[in-house]
Amino acid sequence: MVKFSYREQNGGREVMAKYERPEYTVLLSEEPFELREYRDFYIVEYDNAADPGVDSGFGTLFRYISKDNQADRKISMTVPVIQELSEDRMKMAFVVPKAEWEDIPQPNSPSLTVKKFDSGLFAVIQYGGYSNDRKEQDMLEKLAQWVQEKKYQPASNYMLASFNAPFVPPMFRHNEIM
């Protein structure tokens, strides 16, 4: 994994945060689009099929990295938080830090699963500001058009990758549709 950093102004003082993110190589860049080749990485995924009354799995995932796992071990936060964009169910995932790959703690929650995210090619569009349904749909349509123009074939549902905590101001936010 590579280190990703962002800077923000907070009451006049600069705050620096560093998080791991999956490793990838940019094969093609046509701003705001990129074609990336990701290396294998692991995720802990929340799927609301096991708990359909819950809208978001963020709390369940956060508890997992905060020691609610079978090893009772705290796990570092990483970026991005990944959400699968699907109409019939909600899936959200945290990326597992590379230091944990040899012994990934199993979740206590039946809504969570550890999965290997196999290497592969991903078309990506990057955008800033707060993300919402309308903006995500607009970005998804732009990405789908770019993918079609390049004559690529999507092999999975699109995903939203969020890189910032909710309190980060819009001008410093980074989001991606993959």
Task: Give names to the regions the model predicted.
Residues 2-178:
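A solvent-exposed interaction/effector surface
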